[in-house]
Amino acid sequence: MRKKLDPIHPGEILLEEFLDPMSISQYRLAKDISVPARRINEIAHGKRSISANTALRLSKYFGTTERFWMNLQTRYDLEVEKDRLGSRLDDEVQRLATG
């Protein structure tokens, strides 16, 4: 049986696909987008979610869409919750019978 991989936090994407390749420090990003450095650090370490406010700022800074960042966060949140619920969801919720 294949082992399920852990969901990828948006902070990992921010670090590995944006900050590291562009040689941008977390501190510089925070200053450039006018947010506390702690916010970026917590996102980068998977301790904080990307809010709509942060998504708007990141999208403007990196030339992406705000949906890109929000979709990363939403997908992560769903995967974490799916893992947490496990088979309980099937036991607790039945599909609505139609027609």
Regions found by a protein language model. Give the residues of each.
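Short, basic-rich loop-to-helix N-cap that marks the start of a DNA-contacting helix
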Residues: 47-60
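Short, charged recognition helix plus adjacent turn
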Residues: 70-99
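A short, Lys/Arg-rich alpha-helix, primarily the initiator
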Residues: 1-24, 71
